[in-house]
Amino acid sequence: LVIIGLYVRLRMTETPIFRKAVEQDRVVKHPLRSLLPYWKEVLLGTFAMGITYSLFYVLGTWSLSYAVKVMKPPFSQNEYLAMQMVSVVFFAIFIFVTCIYSDKLGRKTVLISTTLATLVFSLFAMQSLQHNVLTVMLFLCVGFALMGGLFGPCGAYLPELFPTHVRYSGAGLSYNLAAILGGAFAPAISTALVKSTGAVESVGWYLAVMSLLALIALFLIKESKDEDYEK
């Protein structure tokens, strides 16, 4: 993977828009300072992206721990990992699908639709977390499909929130803050909720709150599909 990553990076070139900015001396020396006027865009990008990471860590980390250690009777770790390996295929497929449709229909249309579907999933899907291969596979496959739908367009809509001179800094900061907000504490929060309430459905309510925050942010973000980015 390191060799493949290095090969790809060595063969990548700067975008025409960035090269034009370099030629016109519009590249800033202190991008974080220049990013300050765009703090609203950073926050909107962070909250719009947050549910993606919450869903990822609930599906990929917390649910494994729950199925192996808490569920009665439990799955073995190998059994649950095998189910995750199969269901993650849906993640890859829906990244591809939603990338295509975000170019056709717009980023907001695809993301709002997928986030609404994630909200509905959050409210009902946790009931399927029981020792039943079919229901768990349904939970994982639908969950990873939704995560792919949320993750796919992020490479477009996050950079498109910002002008050229702070585009990478703004997108990178939003992306990584979303990872902290949505992902860093998701397994711990989920475990604490189940422990305190005794109900696995409480994890779904947590995901529903994150979905609502993402929806608010998405409604406030302007559609960017047809914007002129040479500015």
List each language-model region with its residue ranges.
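Extracytoplasmic gate region of multi-pass secondary transporters
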Residues: W39-A92, G182-P187
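A late C-terminal transmembrane helix in Major Facilitator Superfamily
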Residues: H165-T197
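Multi-pass alpha-helical transporter architecture, strongest
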Residues: G5, R9-R11, Y157, A208-K231
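Hydrophobic core of transmembrane alpha-helices in multi-pass small-molecule transporters
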Residues: L134-G149
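Intracellular juxtamembrane helix-capping segments at the cytosolic ends
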Residues: G149-F162
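Cytoplasmic membrane-interface "Motif A"-like loop-to-helix N-cap segments
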Residues: K104-T115
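C-terminal ends and interior cores of transmembrane alpha-helices
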Residues: L116-H131
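Flexible cytoplasmic inter-helical loops of multi-pass small-molecule transporters
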Residues: L10-H30, E230-K231
